[in-house]
């Protein structure tokens, strides 16, 4: 499949793109190369190929999520350079 410059100009207009004549010619060449590559993909026989949901059959193996206390709130606040009651104090970073 190949499109002429006039058709590509109409498509560009619908997409609200503006090209000068030289750029439109270059874009037309590139666009037609992409379309010819897609035509080659359409020639591939995929009769016995199942559609893919994922690119890989690999699964994520995750550990079981177990709730446990590793450090208490008070211990965490002991290491804080600044604190306010039960909260960490941090420098303001919004301008």
From Swiss-Prot:
Signal peptide: none
UniProt keyword annotations, A-Z: ATP-binding, Ligase, Nucleotide-binding, Protein biosynthesis
A GO molecular-function annotation: asparaginyl-tRNA synthase (glutamine-hydrolyzing) activity
Cystine residue pairs: none
EC number: 6.3.5.-
InterPro entries named in the record: Asp/Glu-ADT_sf_sub_c (IPR036113), GatC (IPR003837)
Biological processes annotated in GO: glutaminyl-tRNAGln biosynthesis via transamidation; regulation of translational fidelity; translation
Pfam families found in the cross-reference section: GatC
Top-rank taxon: Bacteria
Catalytic activity: L-glutamyl-tRNA(Gln) + L-glutamine + ATP + H2O = L-glutaminyl-tRNA(Gln) + L-glutamate + ADP + phosphate + H(+); L-aspartyl-tRNA(Asn) + L-glutamine + ATP + H2O = L-asparaginyl-tRNA(Asn) + L-glutamate + ADP + phosphate + 2 H(+)
The protein's enzyme class: ligase
The protein's assembly and partners: Heterotrimer of A, B and C subunits.
Role according to the record: Allows the formation of correctly charged Asn-tRNA(Asn) or Gln-tRNA(Gln) through the transamidation of misacylated Asp-tRNA(Asn) or Glu-tRNA(Gln) in organisms which lack either or both of asparaginyl-tRNA or glutaminyl-tRNA synthetases. The reaction takes place in the presence of glutamine and ATP through an activated phospho-Asp-tRNA(Asn) or phospho-Glu-tRNA(Gln).
The family this protein is said to belong to: Belongs to the GatC family.
Descriptive protein name: Aspartyl/glutamyl-tRNA(Asn/Gln) amidotransferase subunit C
Organism: Cytophaga hutchinsonii (strain ATCC 33406 / DSM 1761 / CIP 103989 / NBRC 15051 / NCIMB 9469 / D465)
């Amino acid at each position: 499949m190949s499109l002429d410059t006039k058709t590509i100009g109409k498509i560009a207009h619908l997409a609200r793109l503006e090209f000068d004549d030289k750029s439109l010619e270059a874009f037309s060449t590139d666009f037609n190369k992409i379309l010819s590559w897609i035509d080659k993909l359409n020639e591939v026989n995929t009769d016995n190929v199942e559609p893919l949901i994922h690119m890989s059959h690999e699964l994520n193996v995750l550990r079981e999520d177990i709730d446990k206390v590793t450090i208490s709130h008070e211990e965490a606040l002991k290491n804080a350079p600044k604190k306010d009651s039960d909260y960490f104090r941090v420098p303001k970073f919004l301008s």
